[in-house]
């Protein structure tokens, strides 16, 4: 159990972090006494700040300035957050109403990051559900010409993928119908990974008049949708990163590059598996070099207990952690409600 002195020093640190998040200006002992009810003398505050600095939680950037939190200080602050202030009823209604206006899954997710970027004043990202975990709802086969087909794959997550298939020989309308029925019989309710074997068997056993066409269609589906599923991100609010303080502005190009390349964020969001937990990576805790001057707050979204993907925000290390955690969690929860039709 922490001693009274340790508890007081944490309160001093909490006050420094809160003030710095609000002002982005170094915090001095005089300002702490004026702004916070710490109920101790200025000498005690200065001594506590000295100990916190020695322990690596705060740093004095210039001899005549106050202190600013270090990443270690932010980490202790975040780890000590137990009670997240809930959003107001008006905020919750506004979030749900905005998300319910989405016409499909991708539109709902696009709205979710627009909302998150506005609520947090950070860059917001969401990962579209990967085809690895999606189940096939329907496969539409459209004849574009006698020797060209369009395959439209629709999953239970609402994702739609389209692929063109060039044929070696013309296909009649009734053959297109047979092809569609066979594909749906093999794919319906299966994950695309599980469907790979079924597609290969389907090619071997298809009627002779459409066997070569079935082989081509199955090959396209297996090669592009099973073996190489395309993960995608939706990004909103990147311009928020350009409004940082002078001290952090130099790192903006690297962070923007990480967001634009998508690979870094896809890797991070792909590791999100928990619908009920918000993860915070601060500065050097981020594996990728491009994000080591930023903080990333992520959680999972989904429905019926299944995680479909990750969403979150990217911002400076001096972000409003309690508010950001609350808003990321709330938006993810309401995305799940909309997807579940609640």
UniProtKB/Swiss-Prot annotation:
Keywords: Repressor, Stress response, Transcription, Transcription regulation. PANTHER family: HEAT-INDUCIBLE TRANSCRIPTION REPRESSOR HRCA. GO terms for molecular function: DNA binding. Negative regulator of class I heat shock genes (grpE-dnaK-dnaJ and groELS operons). Prevents heat-shock induction of these operons. Coiled coil: none annotated. One of its GO terms (biological process) is negative regulation of DNA-templated transcription. InterPro entries: GAF-like_dom_sf (IPR029016), HrcA (IPR002571), HrcA_C (IPR021153), WH-like_DNA-bd_sf (IPR036388), WH_DNA-bd_sf (IPR036390), WHTH_transcript_rep_HrcA_IDD (IPR023120). Belongs to the HrcA family. It comes from Corynebacterium efficiens (strain DSM 44549 / YS-314 / AJ 12310 / JCM 11189 / NBRC 100395). This is Heat-inducible transcription repressor HrcA. HAMAP family: HrcA. The keyword Transcription regulation applies.
